[in-house]
Curated annotation (Swiss-Prot):
Domain notes: Has the structural arrangement of an alpha-helix connected to antiparallel beta-sheets by disulfide bonds (CS-alpha/beta).
UniProt KW Magnesium keyword: no
Transmembrane feature ranges: none
Protein known as: Toxin To10
Subcellular location: Secreted
UniProt keyword annotations, A-Z: Amidation, Disulfide bond, Ion channel impairing toxin, Neurotoxin, Secreted, Signal, Toxin, Voltage-gated sodium channel impairing toxin
Tissue specificity remark: Expressed by the venom gland.
CDD domains the record matches: neurotoxins_LC_scorpion
GO cellular component: extracellular region
Intrachain disulfide bonds: 30-79, 34-55, 41-62, 45-64
Positions of the LCN-type CS-alpha/beta domain: 21-80
Function: Alpha toxins bind voltage-independently at site-3 of sodium channels (Nav) and inhibit the inactivation of the activated channels, thereby blocking neuronal transmission.
UniProt source species: Tityus obscurus
């Protein structure tokens, strides 16, 4: 099989696919505290176009599965309210 044909077919199969990521959603560089409320986090995550979410009990913060690739998630560092 010709390698260029193989590459063309692989490119067509992956065209239009969205990559998704998991993480703590943020607003103003601060994650959302949840108080152990899974329903709140699931709703919050779905509003941000994620597949689902839950309250991660260790950090008591909402964690989302399947966020769009362009969604902001918590990185390293401190929360800076008001900063986008």
């Amino acid at each position: 099989m010709n390698y260029s044909t193989l590459i063309a077919v692989a490119s067509l199969l992956t065209a239009g696919t969205e990559s998704k990521k998991d993480g703590y959603p943020v607003e103003g560089s601060c994650a959302f505290p949840c108080g152990y409320d899974n329903a709140y986090c699931d709703k919050l995550c779905k509003e941000r176009k994620a597949d689902s979410g839950y309250c991660y009990w260790v950090n008591i913060l909402c964690y989302c599965y399947g966020l769009p690739d362009n969604a902001a998630i918590k990185g390293y560092g401190r929360c800076k309210p008001g900063k986008k």
